[in-house]
């Protein structure tokens, strides 16, 4: 052949290799498609197969299947513990129905107030930025004596006041207010 043939030999080799790869890929895709169609025909006719009794296995606690063969047991709904709540009242008891309306609004409020008016809000006083060294030792001794006297007063109360103390713990806002008041130093 002449030296001006147009395409070098390696381009013809590359073109032949790509053509061969295309033919092989086409053969694999066609065989995969035929195999898939044959499997679908097998699965279509599998519903006609009836298993023998010993082949059918029913699980004790099935997750997804075998639910149609299980006989439902009668449920006893009294086995659950009743929640602690207000008992249901009948319409024939007018005294009990009117009783919650007589309770003040503060007693019914549990945790958060929904009143967003400025009138009801109180600001906390700003903390003073004085160093402990600036205060005299007398004020520290006085606060320690006051705390000891408060502890002694609490212990000296008779048992009748235990009801008042327990009611303080029922109201979290009041309890935290008392704790904050005890922590702030007396000036």
UniProtKB/Swiss-Prot annotation:
GO biological processes? adaptive immune response; negative regulation of receptor recycling; negative regulation of transport; positive regulation of calcium-mediated signaling; positive regulation of T cell receptor signaling pathway
- Which Pfam family, just one, is annotated for this protein? SIT
Which residues does the entry place in the Cytoplasmic compartment? 29-187
Residue ranges for the region (Disordered) are 117-138
Q: Name one GO cellular component term.
A: T cell receptor complex
Origin superkingdom: Eukaryota
Q: Does the keyword Secreted apply?
A: no
- The transmembrane residues are 8-28
Post-translational modification remark: Phosphorylated on tyrosines upon TCR activation.
| Membrane topology classification | Single-pass type III membrane protein
Q: What tissue specificity is annotated for this entry?
A: Present in T-cells (at protein level).
What this protein is reported to do is described as: Stabilizes the TCR (T-cell antigen receptor)/CD3 complex at the surface of T-cells.
**What's the protein called, per UniProt?**
T-cell receptor-associated transmembrane adapter 1
What organism does the UniProt record list as the source? Mus musculus (Mouse)
């Amino acid at each position: 052949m002449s030296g001006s043939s147009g395409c070098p030999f390696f381009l013809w080799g590359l073109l032949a290799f790509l053509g061969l790869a295309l033919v092989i890929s086409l053969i694999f895709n066609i065989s995969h498609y035929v195999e898939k169609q044959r499997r679908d025909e097998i699965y279509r006719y599998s519903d006609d197969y009836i298993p023998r009794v010993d082949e059918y296995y029913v699980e004790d606690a099935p997750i997804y299947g075998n639910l149609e063969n299980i006989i439902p047991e009668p449920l006893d709904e009294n086995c659950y513990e009743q929640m602690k709540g207000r008992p249901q009242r009948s319409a024939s008891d007018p005294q009990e129905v009117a009783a919650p309306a007589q309770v003040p609004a503060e007693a019914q409020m549990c945790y958060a107030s929904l009143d967003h008016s400025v009138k009801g809000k109180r600001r906390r006083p700003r903390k003073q930025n004085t160093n402990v060294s600036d205060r005299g030792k007398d004020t520290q001794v006085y606060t320690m004596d006051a705390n000891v006297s408060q502890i002694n007063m609490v212990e000296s109360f008779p048992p009748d006041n235990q009801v008042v103390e327990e009611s303080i713990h029922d109201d979290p806002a009041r309890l935290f207010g008392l704790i904050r008041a005890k922590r702030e130093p007396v000036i």
